[in-house]
Amino acid sequence: LPGIAEVMEYLHEIGVKMAVASNGKEEHIRTGLKRKGFEKYIGAIATKEEVENPKPASDVYLLAANKLGVNIENSIAIEDSKPGAIGASKSGATLILQTNDITKHMDFTGVQYAYKDVDLLETIKDVVENK
């Protein structure tokens, strides 16, 4: 996601816990995080391998929040996929939907997002200050 490195650095600086909630395999996620230098920011990884129902269910988000020891209602989910957005929306987290070239033409009707296609860092700052 464009701007995610700046978001992670900002959240890390102010002490916000971060997790990855993914339908991918943990091994692949860890490799990607390490390659991008993001592993130092991530306190937990929750994957479809650990839950009964993967995205678009909310299970992986709930597990990620549980692993971090935080309440899902106080969490922010940043998503760029329809299944992820549906799952995040169902979880009770504040959803920031950032579409990409593939997903920008998809119908997200029924997905309860707080923000869509915004300046990610500025939006995160606003949300964190108001949580």
Model regions and ranges:
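Metal-dependent phosphoesterase signature
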Residues: L1-E9, E13-I14
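Short, flexible segments with low predicted structural confidence
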Residues: I4, K17-M18, K36, V60
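Asp-based, Mg2+/Mn2+-dependent phosphohydrolase catalytic module
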Residues: E9-H12, K25-E26, R30-K131
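Hydrophobic beta-strand core positions in alpha/beta domains
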Residues: A19-V20, L97
